[in-house]
Swiss-Prot record:
One of its GO terms (cellular component) is cytosol. Its EC number is 2.1.1.228. It comes from Anaeromyxobacter dehalogenans (strain 2CP-C). Keywords: Cytoplasm, Methyltransferase, S-adenosyl-L-methionine, Transferase, tRNA processing. CDD domains: TrmD-like. It is an enzyme of class 2 (transferase). Specifically methylates guanosine-37 in various tRNAs. The keyword Cell membrane does not apply. This is tRNA (guanine-N(1)-)-methyltransferase. The lineage of its organism: Bacteria, Pseudomonadati, Myxococcota, Myxococcia, Myxococcales. One of its GO terms (biological process) is tRNA N1-guanine methylation. It is found in: Cytoplasm. GO terms for molecular function: tRNA (guanine(37)-N1)-methyltransferase activity. The keyword Glycosyltransferase does not apply.
């Protein structure tokens, strides 16, 4: 049975515990499809106060995470999870996308090291396999990014989602990476806004064509950078501008 094993190394364990215990991730752990451990980096610090940060050499604002506690936490995690990839959450990292999330899910073992303060001592990089970012912005720490990695990867593990087709139909899924089509549920009319007729028709072929058209339109309008990378057949180029009566 495939499953995802993760160990999150953090200075603030409670920030991660709540999220991992709820909703799909909580159920995945109960089902044995996700094994999530949270390690307090301070457990690997020395001294009475277990200090994990210090002033940067060369001067400058803020504090830098010391190498000893984090590297020792990584080494201990590697011993628990042989073969795991060590991933440091960092604005300098590769952008997390669906393809990378799938690689993480398929690999099955991750050690996620969360940065804090002004950054991490560069010597820690000798113990890291890769750095990952969730966008071109700066957060207070790497915990939110680590949780994004776990969430994105775990939902791709077979059995985690109730309907296996859910992951395949979502935005960025599949080789094309299109955005998802719009979703509707009851009631059929809300404040004068009606659900598209085609979704109520029961005609599965028309529904699939409508969903395909709307995914193409959404990607073209909202993420032209993605749209220009997709090689579309002539049928899709015709479909994207087709009216509902042409579906």
């Amino acid at each position: 049975m495939a499953r995802l094993e993760v160990d999150i190394l953090t200075l603030f364990p409670r920030m991660c515990a709540g999220y991992l215990g709820e909703s799909i991730l909580g159920k995945a752990q109960e089902a044995g499809l996700l094994a999530a451990t949270i390690t307090d980096i301070r457990d690997h610090a020395t001294g009475k106060h277990r200090v994990c940060d210090d002033a940067p050499y060369g001067g400058g604002a803020g504090m830098v995470m010391k190498p000893e506690p984090l590297v020792e936490a990584i080494e201990a995690a590697r011993a628990r999870l042989p073969g795991a990839w060590v991933v440091l959450t960092s604005p300098r990292g590769a952008r997390l996308d669906q393809a990378l999330a799938r690689r993480f899910a398929e690999h099955g073992r991750l050690i996620l090291a969360c940065g804090r303060y002004e950054g991490v001592d560069e010597r820690v990089m000798t113990a890291v396999d890769m750095q990952v970012s969730i966008g071109d912005f700066v957060l207070t720490g790497g915990e939110l990014a680590a949780l994004c990695v776990v969430d994105a990867a775990a939902r791709l593990v077979p059995g985690v989602l109730g309907n296996a087709a859910s992951a395949d139909a979502e935005s960025f899924a599949g080789a094309e990476g299109l955005l998802e089509y719009p979703q509707y549920t009851r009631p059929p009319e809300f404040r004068g806004m009606r659900v598209p007729e085609v979704l109520l028709s029961g005609d599965h072929r028309r529904i699939e064509r409508w969903r395909r058209r709307e995914a193409l339109r959404a990607t073209r309008e909202r993420r032209p950078d993605l749209f220009t990378r997709v090689s579309l057949p002539e049928s899709d180029l015709r479909l994207i501008d087709a009216g509902d009566d042409e579906l």
